[in-house]
């Protein structure tokens, strides 16, 4: 779960990291009131969960209350990288003397945490790595032992960080690490971390929380912005389905994340593109299967659906019952592969169901199913 900038800054501030004064606005009148309170010179920041807001026109400076109001009128309701701007964070304009970068992220390759520091900032970390490789430092952190002082010194040296900022940057890195561990985050980032006459300030903030840890952080769960989620992904969340929308035309339904990803790989191998990732999990009932099918078919880009089930905890006959109910009036081509627990019973249900339905195809293997689905998608 990714938090908005204003939410992340509230958490950073709570833990002692300095941020500029600011408030959230949901209307032009809110912007007027906040701008007046902050003295007129403000920065208006669209609160949408995408990167590169500045380059896309989602961040604007205003040097008077009236200018802030006029720019807010332009921003509210505008579309920024596919997202409608409904909230603006109004922040006091600060004097920026230098921009830097500090962040921590999950390092899956090393099965730990990566601490990253750069003496330049204000751009994507990937861009920094290309343009200023000598000014970026990265170090692996073992969560068992934490972030040590000698590792921070190594980061400061290798990033060519001016010594006058060492003490403050070191303190911020330690705080970011505490935040990451406490909230079980996947990413904690300040970009840019700016130098001002009053010290270092987090001019932007990112905090991504591991969805699997949210049951231990009910206070953070309340911060989730469902209006920012894709409509279908939001529906999937509400129904407890693991769904990610993609840009292909072959709908995918599988039981288990590994099975779903393997199915998607096969679709790519045979020249197609999956329209989604959808894992119904283990032990899915007919009702869950029906909900999953309806979700896939609500995507207008889907030309064919490939259902790939290997029954373990999930029973093939239970899946077949759900498919029978969900697909009774569907004309979209459907390819089904059932194997595993109660496979014979499931196939009997499917064979009977497919008799008068030329759009329904039952296959023996994953490879056969993926190839068939891609071919059908090309023909539609």
UniProtKB/Swiss-Prot annotation:
Keyword terms of this UniProt record: ATP-binding, Ligase, Magnesium, Metal-binding, Nucleotide-binding, Tricarboxylic acid cycle
Transmembrane segments: none
E.C. designation(s): 6.2.1.5
A Pfam match: ATP-grasp_2
EC top class, as a word: ligase
Biological processes, Gene Ontology terms: succinyl-CoA metabolic process; tricarboxylic acid cycle
Catalytic activity: succinate + ATP + CoA = succinyl-CoA + ADP + phosphate; GTP + succinate + CoA = succinyl-CoA + GDP + phosphate
Positions with a binding annotation for ATP: 45, 52-54, 91, 94, 99
Entry note: cofactor: Binds 1 Mg(2+) ion per subunit.
Pathway: Carbohydrate metabolism; tricarboxylic acid cycle; succinate from succinyl-CoA (ligase route): step 1/1
Molecular function as annotated in GO: ATP binding; magnesium ion binding; succinate-CoA ligase (ADP-forming) activity; succinate-CoA ligase (GDP-forming) activity
Residues annotated as domain ATP-grasp: 9-235
GO cellular component: succinate-CoA ligase complex
SUPFAM superfamilies with a match to the protein in the record: Glutathione synthetase ATP-binding domain-like, Succinyl-CoA synthetase domains
InterPro entries from the UniProt entry: ATP-grasp, ATP-grasp_succ-CoA_synth-type, ATP_grasp_subdomain_1, Succ-CoA_synthase_bsu_CS, SUCC_ACL_C, Succ_CoA_ligase-like_bsu, Succinyl-CoA_synth-like
Binding-site residues, substrate: 255, 312-314
Residues binding Mg(2+), per UniProt: 191, 204
Listed cofactors: Mg(2+)
PANTHER family: SUCCINATE--COA LIGASE [GDP-FORMING] SUBUNIT BETA, MITOCHONDRIAL, SUCCINYL-COA SYNTHETASE BETA CHAIN
Free-text function comment from the UniProt entry: Succinyl-CoA synthetase functions in the citric acid cycle (TCA), coupling the hydrolysis of succinyl-CoA to the synthesis of either ATP or GTP and thus represents the only step of substrate-level phosphorylation in the TCA. The beta subunit provides nucleotide specificity of the enzyme and binds the substrate succinate, while the binding sites for coenzyme A and phosphate are found in the alpha subunit.
Subunit structure: Heterotetramer of two alpha and two beta subunits.
UniProt similarity note: Belongs to the succinate/malate CoA ligase beta subunit family.
Protein name as it appears in the record: Succinate--CoA ligase [ADP-forming] subunit beta 2
Gene: sucC2
């Amino acid at each position: 779960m990714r938090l908005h900038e204003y939410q992340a800054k509230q958490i950073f501030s709570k833990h002692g990291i300095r941020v500029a004064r600011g408030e959230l606005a949901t209307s032009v009148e809110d912007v007027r009131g906040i701008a007046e309170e902050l003295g007129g010179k403000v920065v208006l920041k669209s609160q949408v969960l995408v990167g590169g807001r500045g380059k896309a026109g989602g961040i604007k400076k205003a040097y008077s209350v009236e200018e802030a109001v006029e720019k807010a009128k332009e921003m509210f309701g505008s579309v920024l990288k596919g997202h409608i701007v409904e909230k603006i964070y109004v922040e006091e304009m600060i004097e920026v003397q230098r921009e830097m970068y500090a962040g921590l992220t999950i390092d899956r390759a090393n099965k730990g945490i990566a601490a990253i520091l750069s003496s330049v900032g204000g751009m994507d970390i990937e861009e920094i790595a290309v343009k200023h490789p000598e000014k970026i430092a990265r170090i692996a952190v073992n969560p068992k032992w934490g972030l040590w002082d000698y590792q921070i010194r190594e980061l400061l040296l290798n990033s060519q960080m001016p010594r006058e900022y060492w003490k403050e940057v070191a303190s911020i890195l330690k705080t970011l690490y505490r935040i990451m561990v406490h909230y079980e985050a996947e990413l904690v980032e300040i970009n840019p971390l700016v130098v001002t006459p009053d010290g270092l300030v987090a001019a932007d903030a990112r905090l991504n929380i591991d969805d699997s840890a949210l049951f231990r952080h009910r206070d953070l769960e309340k911060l989730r912005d469902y209006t920012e989620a894709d409509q279908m992904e939001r529906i999937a969340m509400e129904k407890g389905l693991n769904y990610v929308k993609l840009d292909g035309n072959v709908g995918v339904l599988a039981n288990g994340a590994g099975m779903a990803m393997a199915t998607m790989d096969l679709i790519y191998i045979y020249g197609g593109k999956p329209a989604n990732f959808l894992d119904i999990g283990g032990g899915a009932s007919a009702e869950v299967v029906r909900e999953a099918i309806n979700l896939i078919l609500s995507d207008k880009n889907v030309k064919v659906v490939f259902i790939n089930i290997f029954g373990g905890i999930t029973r093939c006959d239970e899946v077949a019952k759900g498919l029978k109910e969900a697909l009774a009036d569907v004309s979209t081509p459907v390819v089904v592969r059932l194997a595993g627990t109660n496979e014979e019973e499931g196939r009997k249900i499917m064979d009977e169901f497919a008799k008068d339905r030329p759009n329904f195809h039952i296959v023996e293997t994953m490879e056969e199913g993926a190839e068939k689905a891609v071919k059908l998608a090309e023909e539609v």
